[in-house]
């Protein structure tokens, strides 16, 4: 049995136990404490914290998420950190409402309902929760899907909302050599079982916030944003919302009719498809299409973006460009929420 130590989190005054053979983030989940996090693989810095006292060692993390100078100062990524003594840790990023009020992590056995291509490289995977018969999550969160016959998993965002209790939809981008996405080419069949673990992530609408919502997405980043929009439509959320979706061509667009329909129940909703290669091609007449990178289109329309809350989700180059744009336009960091769908070495 691995040795166990006490972790005290400041400034929230929460204490928990952690074993030496588990990382601090997983130990928190196990005890119902929901710390801020993103990728859970040492790549995004969402769980970056500061060690005030104690011995902690990190493993297998990206220096882009926590560089050597930061490590020397005492910064750590909780998803990669193991404690070898009692520790006091300062949380740099936390949501007091979520800390002890998040949704518990669940292990769910699911059955495949449908595998449907949406574009040349985006596939909709719809699963039915079987045991238990319902999967609880917050719109915008993600889950781990376990690769059948292996100990491995891949993480994907839900596109549905909890109100659709009989199925969960994922939008998955196919990558060459991707261990999970390769299964979508005929290897996963209707009726197959897939194990799911979750929910994870902090890419959620914040209760009580009133600023307009600006969503910027690309690729499979459609999934969590679609979940947020579906939730806003279902609940009659009174916040204005705009959605900018970046793609290469019109052939890479999907769910356009549903987005327009959702927008009818969202205050002052606007949707603009941003096409980086060509604005030619057939799209529904009510869809606004502009040529250019998604950040350039946003810049043309959002002169007061510092007075909004921004939700970003998509491939890393798009997210990085958008973060740079938001920083240049003085958008406060606590008004920016993002998921970056990484890869090359972490294939899908």
Curated annotation (Swiss-Prot):
Keyword Metal-binding attached: yes
Alphabetical list of InterPro entries matching this protein: 2Fe-2S_ferredoxin-like_sf, 2Fe-2S_ferredoxin-type, 2Fe2S_fd_BS, Beta-grasp_dom_sf, Cbr1-like_FAD-bd_dom, FAD-bd_FR_type, Flavoprot_Pyr_Nucl_cyt_Rdtase, FNR_nucleotide-bd
Keywords assigned by UniProt, alphabetized: 2Fe-2S, FAD, Flavoprotein, Iron, Iron-sulfur, Metal-binding, Oxidoreductase
Co-factor binding details: Binds 1 2Fe-2S cluster.
Residues annotated as domain FAD-binding FR-type: 105-206
Binding residues annotated for [2Fe-2S] cluster, in chain numbering: 39, 44, 47, 79
Keyword Cell division: no
GO MF annotation list: 2 iron, 2 sulfur cluster binding; metal ion binding; oxidoreductase activity
Its EC number(s): 1.18.1.-
Cofactor: FAD; [2Fe-2S] cluster
Family: Belongs to the bacterial ring-hydroxylating dioxygenase ferredoxin reductase family.
Subunit (UniProt): The propane 2-monooxygenase multicomponent enzyme system is composed of an electron transfer component and a monooxygenase component interacting with the effector protein MimD. The electron transfer component is composed of a reductase (MimB), and the monooxygenase component is formed by a large subunit (MimA) and a small subunit (MimC).
PANTHER family according to UniProt: NADH OXIDOREDUCTASE HCR, PROTEIN RFBI
Protein name: Propane 2-monooxygenase, reductase component
Organism: Mycolicibacterium goodii
Lineage: Bacteria, Bacillati, Actinomycetota, Actinomycetes, Mycobacteriales
């Amino acid at each position: 049995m691995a040795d166990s130590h006490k972790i005290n989190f400041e400034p929230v005054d929460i204490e928990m136990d952690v074993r030496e053979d588990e990382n601090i983030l997983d130990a928190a989940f196990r005890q119902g404490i929901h710390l801020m996090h993103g990728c859970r693989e040492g790549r995004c810095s969402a769980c970056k914290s500061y060690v005030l006292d104690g011995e902690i060692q990190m493993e297998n993390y990206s220096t882009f998420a926590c560089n050597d100078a930061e490590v020397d100062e005492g910064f750590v990524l909780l998803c990669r950190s193991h404690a070898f003594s009692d520790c006091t840790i300062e949380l740099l990023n936390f949501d007091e409402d979520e800390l002890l009020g998040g949704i518990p992590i669940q292990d769910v056995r699911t059955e495949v309902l449908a595998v449907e291509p949406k574009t040349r490289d985006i596939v909709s995977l719809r699963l039915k929760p079987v045991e238990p018969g319902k999967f609880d999550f917050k719109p915008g969160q993600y889950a781990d899907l376990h690769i059948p016959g292996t100990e491995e998993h891949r993480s994907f965002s839900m596109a549905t909302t909890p109100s659709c209790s009989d199925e969960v939809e994922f939008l998955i981008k196919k990558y060459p050599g991707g261990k999970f996405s390769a299964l979508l080419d005929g290897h996963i069949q209707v009726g197959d079982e897939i194990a799911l673990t979750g929910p994870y992530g902090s890419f959620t609408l914040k209760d009580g916030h009133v600023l307009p919502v600006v969503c910027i997405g690309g690729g499979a980043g459609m999934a969590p944003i679609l979940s947020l929009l579906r939730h806003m439509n279902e609940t009659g959320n009174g916040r204005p919302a705009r959605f900018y979706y970046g793609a290469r061509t019109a052939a890479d667009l999907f769910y356009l009719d549903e987005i327009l329909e959702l927008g009818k129940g969202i205050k002052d909703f606007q949707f603009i498809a941003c096409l980086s290669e060509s604005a030619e091609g057939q799209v529904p007449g009510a869809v606004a299409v502009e040529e250019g990178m998604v950040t350039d289109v946003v810049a043309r329309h959002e002169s007061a973006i510092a007075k909004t809350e921004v939700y970003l989700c998509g491939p890393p180059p798009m997210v990085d460009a958008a973060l740079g744009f938001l920083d240049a336009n003085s958008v406060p960091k606590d008004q920016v929420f993002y998921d970056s769908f990484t890869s090359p070495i972490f294939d899908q």
